[in-house]
Amino acid sequence: MSHNTFGHLFRVTTWGESHGAALGCVVDGCPPGIRFTRDEIQAELDKRRPGQSRFVTQRREPDEVKVLSGFVLDEDGETMITTGTPVSMLIENVDQRSKDYGEIARQYRPGHADYTYDVKYGIRDYRGGGRSSARETAARVAAGALARKVVPGMVVRGALVSMGEKSIDRANWNWNFIGDAENPFFTPDPASVPVFTQYLDGIRKAGSSVGAVIEIVADGVPPGLGAPIYAKLDQDIASGLMSINAVKGVEIGNGFEAARITGEQNADEMRIGNDGKPVFLSNNAGGILGGISTGQAIVARFAVKPTSSILTPRKSIDKDGNDVEVMTKGRHDPCVGIRAVPIGEAMVACAIADHYLRHRGQTGKGIGSRE
């Protein structure tokens, strides 16, 4: 299997499977002199970690990261400083239950990659989906934690804005509420917590699942990142988000809503601000024009389908060509969109970090220069 690497200068390779001994990533191209701590990497992984509420898989993985290479320790004994060589990180799997998957070793689960992996490779790891499992994304989150350090002043945040037929009230948006102990959904709307709780409890008790829409916002991104035609910043952000398990759609800025309004409504007008710098009067473009960042917040949303692993019996076939009925066992998320929030943040951070380095290398100018 090829294509386990993404990025051009900030290159991330992930490895490992759902029920293997471990998984991890190698980040090649991280500039020297980036200061970070293991705790900063761990904090991002903890946001994605399973088993933290009844609304996510009960697989108990501590996801403790080990940083193996690419750094020297500062005098404080905790701060790591990148040397410019590959940064390798490892996360052990400790709570696999491969026996839960014995019955589907030769059966194809509807909605999963079982059939397509078998068609392409002639072999598949049926234990939790192997490489196609969202377990792999823990490695991306680790890489994304490092990517956040590459672009000075950049802040990448994500939020769950809808779950199934339930949506947040954007008038209540509060970034500080995300991460609150009373908020298991990454919602920025405190009023949505009881709504999501009742809704997802009903879905979960019925043995079913539901999808979600996630919004990622990157502030502090300098203007000038990206390139026309085949190296657009929004193109690479969309590609990264589409690579996440269960993602079926991506939009930047107004996205599909832009097709429903007029040019007067959609085009972001400009003025010169009091400081002599350009100011946009709106951000329908999501911070990107012509594939190049404007300096505004970059806004992307992605749609996550309902988890295919449900308790309801489903019609399928097996490897021998027989009609079968499949009922999934094991531990699964009733809404995989919840834990997709930190994954989406990581993919956006990696894409922007990559374009930051590409811009710096290509133009020879300071970031955002208008010379």
From Swiss-Prot:
Pathway the protein acts in: Metabolic intermediate biosynthesis; chorismate biosynthesis; chorismate from D-erythrose 4-phosphate and phosphoenolpyruvate: step 7/7
UniProt-recorded Gene Ontology molecular function terms: chorismate synthase activity; FMN binding
Alphabetical GO biological process terms: amino acid biosynthetic process; aromatic amino acid family biosynthetic process; chorismate biosynthetic process
EC number: 4.2.3.5
Co-factor: note: Reduced FMN (FMNH(2)).
Keyword Coiled coil (UniProt): no
Reaction equation(s) it catalyzes: 5-O-(1-carboxyvinyl)-3-phosphoshikimate = chorismate + phosphate
Assembly: Homotetramer.
Protein name: Chorismate synthase
Source species: Mesorhizobium japonicum (strain LMG 29417 / CECT 9101 / MAFF 303099)
Annotated gene: aroC
